[in-house]
Amino acid sequence: MNYIELHNISKTYDKGKVLAVNNISLSVSEGEIFGLIGPDGAGKTSIFRMLTTLIIPDSGSAKVLGYDVVKDFRQIRNEVGYMPGRFSLYPDLSVEENLRFYATMFGTTIEENYHLIRDIYVQIEAFGKRKAGQLSGGMKQKLALCCALIHKPKVLFLDEPTTGIDPVSRKELWEMLRKLKTENICIFVSTPYMDEALQCDRIALIQQGEILSIDSPQAVVGQFDKFIYAVSSDDTYKQLKVLMQYPERLNSYPFGEFAHLVVAGELDEIRLGEFLKNNGLNDIRINRINATIEDCFIDLSRQTKV
């Protein structure tokens, strides 16, 4: 069963001058972790705000749990959990007070649904009397997740939940989401971090308000039909400029300590090495590698511009 459905949704701002979401359609099923993957400004938050009934789409239709996001906003708000990108709990209330407030607001108690938040809450329980505004970034996110889950929602919306928190907290949060999946909760999560795509059952890559691809992370990578080589040398900046002149180059870009060179077919690595050396580069290393989600995103973005 589809818990989330979007049909040709569009959204503009500034009296139609800024197109944030352009004719997007997708669906998310019960018990699925679905990732909306893209950089800042891609349209992720606008989609989340439409689905959580905070803003109205300009055109198209969307349903959450069978309810229309415009006509049935009250029903949707009662049955979903939403964790916005910006910390939005009450900073002057303690951890316990925030949690009890949200439980009361939804007509439930902490005890009734404690099994849903237990694994998360035990990590912040020692700070129960501390004001929420005084928590670390990772602790704030854990508290926000507890508050979003306390009424046992069928759909959980998480807008960039790992932005601004440390790597350990990021790892712990994804482990928590995988446990929640076993409760058949539909989890719709957005992130600018391409590596987090692998944590999802399916993903939608989004750029400038348009969907580039929707599939499982493995299928997205499997559809990459080019060859990628990781290249390094003694001068990273010069190396990028030189690679732009290579005849077989389709694309090249920095990737950590390497440059990724994208070509249509298998390369003669010796010939490439000589080309780089003849252009003043030394300590050259060339390795053919498998595409990552980020490589796929860059390639799909490039195709839409051609």
Please state what every model-predicted region is.
Residues 1-9:
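Conserved N-terminal strand/loop that marks the beginning of ABC ATPase nucleotide-binding domains
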Residues 3, 20, 62, 239-242:
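Long alpha-helical scaffolds
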Residues 5, 79, 152, 199, ...:
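Short loop/turn motifs at secondary-structure junctions
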Residues 9, 24, 203, 252, ...:
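Generic beta-strand hydrophobic packing signal
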Residues 11-189, 194-206, 213:
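ABC transporter nucleotide-binding domains
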Residues 77, 118, 221, 297-298:
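Conserved protein kinase catalytic domain
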Residues 175-264:
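ABC transporter nucleotide-binding domain
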Residues 228-306:
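Short, charged/small-residue-rich alpha-helical element at the C-terminal edge
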